[in-house]
Amino acid sequence: MSRVSQARNLGKYFLLIDNMLVVLGFFVVFPLISIRFVDQMGWAAVMVGIALGLRQFIQQGLGIFGGAIADRFGAKPMIVTGMLMRAAGFATMGIAHEPWLLWFSCLLSGLGGTLFDPPRSALVVKLIRPQQRGRFFSLLMMQDSAGAVIGALLGSWLLQYDFRLVCATGAVLFVLCAAFNAWLLPAWKLSTVRTPVREGMTRVMRDKRFVTYVLTLAGYYMLAVQVMLMLPIMVNDVAGAPSAVKWMYAIEACLSLTLLYPIARWSEKHFRLEHRLMAGLLIMSLSMMPVGMVSGLQQLFTLICLFYIGSIIAEPARETLSASLADARARGSYMGFSRLGLAIGGAIGYIGGGWLFDLGKSVHQPELPWMMLGIIGIFTFLALGWQFSQKRAARRLLERDA
């Protein structure tokens, strides 16, 4: 085995261990934020939505800067610094009794993610061969699902005693993750050349096809982020107990562990990436529309199952498509910018979703936020279809001219 192949194999295992620590640290804390501050402390959902949206927008919206800096200086210092900053954010969240302090803790957490998320994504693109990326992204998603359940179970158990224990556990896990990276991560360069920060950012911004694709995905993320805000609140309201939230993540884990990899393997042989992304988005949109009309936990979990199945179909295709469109000369910048759709969609999804949720309750129209999200998903589906049809038409035109 060549040294390059050996490095790739070792890199796969490193990425999987690192991902598990990050997922556990995140899901111990974040699914319980809405339960803690909305249901236990009586805050308006929009106040918590602002906090979650701020974290999302800072982490993903500034991702291009984190990625560009990592292109210049390498992945290791950015990842270690970012994880320590995330740990500080979680520690601050544990003592938050005013909205401004919760917002500040989410700001710290988001800035940490800005530093470590783009270089971690770029390492996947660097270490995993193109023909293997779809399957590897599926493995990461399976791991995400298992980690989400374990994290949510642990967080729910700790929440019975004290929310500060929840946040302290998340902080400790991110400190461990920082130490793991500081000790074992080699000083790898992310790109084929050491690209200056401004040049990497400029290269991305001139790629109109990539920019349009990323911005359109904002609508997809408006739906996806509700697993952190409105779906846990809805499960808690219907069940009457916050402990039921862990079953929502258990459903995701069961579906992911049993279906994700087989669906990815089968669909990559029979369908294009864009068709898989659009099919998953359509299922997510249609399953979200009736959520506000259900009154039983069984009906709600059935719709959540459909939503997760749509995500299982769409997410590996979305990740693989984003990676395939990235320029190897500026991987960090591309993977950082690819998070901008999540920044915009996440911020609007959290803040707008929280506001619509409160509005729906006040006017006795609980289905309002869910119907709006479903409509947004349908429009995003149509916009992606138009983009992909334009791309195919341009390709056919070039082939005919040649």
From Swiss-Prot:
What InterPro entries does UniProt report for this protein, alphabetically?
MFS (IPR011701), MFS_dom (IPR020846), MFS_trans_sf (IPR036259), MFS_Transporters (IPR050171), Multidrug-R_MdtH (IPR022855)
Cytoplasmic topology ranges: 1-12, 117-138, 186-213, 265-276, 321-339, 389-402
Q: Tell me the GO BP annotations in alphabetical order.
A: response to antibiotic
Q: How does it sit in the membrane?
A: Multi-pass membrane protein
By its UniProt entry, which SUPFAM superfamilies does this protein fall under?
MFS general substrate transporter
Q: Which cystines does this chain contain?
A: none
What GO cellular component entries does it have?
plasma membrane
CDD domains assigned to the protein according to its UniProt record, in alphabetical order? MFS_MdtH_MDR_like
**Compartment list:** Cell inner membrane
GO molecular function terms noted in the UniProt entry = transmembrane transporter activity
Q: Which UniProt keywords apply?
A: Antibiotic resistance, Cell inner membrane, Cell membrane, Membrane, Transmembrane, Transmembrane helix, Transport
Q: Which residues lie on this side of the membrane: Periplasmic?
A: 34-98, 160-164, 235-243, 298-299, 361-367
The entry's function note states: Confers resistance to norfloxacin and enoxacin.
Xref: PANTHER family? MULTIDRUG RESISTANCE PROTEIN MDTH (PTHR23517:SF2), RESISTANCE PROTEIN MDTM, PUTATIVE-RELATED-RELATED (PTHR23517)
What is the protein name stated in its UniProt record? Multidrug resistance protein MdtH
